[in-house]
Amino acid sequence: MKNLCIIPARGGSKRIPRKNIIDFLGKPLIAYSIENALNSGIFDEIVLSSDDEEIIEVALKYGAKAPFVRDKNLSDDYASSTAAVQNAIEILQSQNQIYDHVCCLYATAPLLNKNILKQAYEKFIQNQSKFLFAATEFEYPIQRAFYLNENNQVYMFDEKHYKSRSQDLTKAYHDAGAFYFGTSKAWLEEDFIFKPHSSVFVLPRNLVCDIDTMQDLEFAKILYKVNHESAF
């Protein structure tokens, strides 16, 4: 079996400029994903998909390969990671580089480690699902969620659950925004991962942080330090 890791990292991040290579406790953010992929020992190649020369330069420095530059039409605010992965697989196939399994690993997942990737890969192989992705449990019952209308009035999505005990409600999970394993065939044929053909690798909440704002970035640093107390 040949395994490929694709790290999508476009250059046009808006809320955190240069997010993928911003300093994170002394190293570019993307370096953590590259090093975890390399140290996991499960990938034959770690390939960057980027439209940005500086990101490519940083990724090469930390051990990834960049055999192509991502097209600009796959690099705007509306471009999906799935489209970027499909594009990368197709380019590599045109170069006679064929892989059985492909992992999309986000550049913004510094809280992971090599063992998590290894365990997730093993579960993916055992489950024989089309995809396996990282997820985590919502910290509050989503059945009790509410929204505000245009007049700032409160409406519950479903009032019948208001008095239910938390332990009686079905647990809900969300995408951790970290990694997605899939067969090459599934990546090329499917445009939506979140279906019964997928399985999940559940991460504890202290290993999950969606880094979209500077506040998120600082919180991720705190989590990293807590998770690696002996190193600080």
Curated annotation (Swiss-Prot):
Keywords: Magnesium, Metal-binding, Nucleotidyltransferase, Transferase
Chemical reaction(s) catalysed: pseudaminate + CTP = CMP-pseudaminate + diphosphate
A GO term, aspect molecular function: N-acylneuraminate cytidylyltransferase activity
Enzyme class name: transferase
Catalytic activity, EC: 2.7.7.81
InterPro entries reported in the protein's UniProt record: CMP-NeuNAc_synthase, Cytidylyl_trans, Nucleotide-diphossugar_trans, PseF
Cofactor: Mg(2+)
Function: Catalyzes the final step in the biosynthesis of pseudaminic acid, a sialic-acid-like sugar that is used to modify flagellin. Mediates the activation of pseudaminic acid with CMP by forming CMP-pseudaminic acid.
Xref: NCBIfam families: PseF (TIGR03584)
Family affiliation: Belongs to the CMP-NeuNAc synthase family.
Descriptive protein name: Pseudaminic acid cytidylyltransferase
